[in-house]
Amino acid sequence: MLPSDVDSRRYVIAYFIGSPQDLPPDFLIHTPPDDFQAGLFLPGDQPDWLGRRRYPPRVLSLVGSELRISTHPSAGQPCQQVPLEHLVYIESGCILLLGWLRFVACDFEQTFPYSTVYRHAVDRFLRRLRARWLAPEDRVQDLPSFDPAQLQDVKFGNALARELDADEVPRAGLFQAPSQLVRRSWFRRWKYRTPADLLVTTPRRLLWLTDRDKGIAASYGTIARYAPHRNIKSLVWETAGQECALRIELLAGKHWRVPIKPEYREAARRLESRYAETSARTVEAGR
C-alpha cells in the first residue's frame, strides 16, 4: 500500500489493488469488502508547463458483477458503473511505452492510457476481470487445439502466450503473416512490412491480436481485442474488387474489420465456420 499521506495526484505508477484497504484514501471510495474483487490505479497525465493535465488519476475496480470507474475527486466527475453483462469487448494495446485499455459496452466507451512499464499490474487486473466476465462455451470445447508453435513468428507467439489465461487453451485459429514489400519513388527505394493478424478461438472468447495501428504495422507492439462468444452476432464477408475483409459483427452495433489477403481466405473461411449458426454473407462494397 502506498503511503496514505501522499496526494494520489502525485503518483506516477500504476498498481494493482488487491483489497479495499489498498484504495487511494483521497478517492473516498467506499466499497463493501465482500463485493470487492480487484482494482487498478492509473496515474494521471503529467502536467505541462502550465500545470494542465489531459486526464486525472483513475481507479478501475471490479465490484460484484460491475466495472466501476472512479476519477480523482478534484476532477468533479461521477463514478461510472458498467455491468459486465453490458460489456461488449475489451481492447488492450501496448506499443513501445504507450499502453491503453479500452472498454466498449452497449452505451459506454472509454480509453485509459498508461505506461507499459507497469503492464504487469494491468495484466493482473485484466485476468481478474476476465475470470468474472468470460465463461467457457461447450460448442468450442471439441475443436482441435491450435498450436502457437506453428506461428513461426516470435512477436505474435509471445503476444498470444502473454494474453492467454492459465486455464485457457487456444482452439481454431488463423495467422495472417506480415509481408515484406518494396516501394519506389523517383530517387528512393525502401522496404516496408504489412501488418499481421492473429485470430484465435478459445472456449471463452474470440481473440484478435494485431500490430495494425492506424493502418500501418507497428514494429514494436501489438493490440488485443476480445469478446465472449455470446457477444458475436455473425461474421460477414466484405469484398471490393480484389480486396476482402472479415467483418465481425458484435452486439450493440459494434464490429471489428480484419482485412484478409487472398492467400488466407480459405483459412478465414474455416474460422468462419465456427459460427455457422450465424449465417455469413458476402457484402459487396457500397451496397
Enumerate the language-model features and the residues they cover.
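Intrinsic disorder/low-complexity detector
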Residues: M1-G64, I90, I95-L198, P203-R204, ...
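N-terminal beta-strand/beta-hairpin edge segment
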Residues: S65-A75
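N-terminal glycine/threonine-rich, aromatic-flanked beta-hairpin/loop signature
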Residues: I69, L209-D211
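Short coil/turn segments at secondary-structure boundaries
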Residues: S74-P78, P113
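Short acidic-glycine-tyrosine-enriched beta hairpin
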Residues: P83
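Active-site-flanking segments in enzyme catalytic domains
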Residues: L87
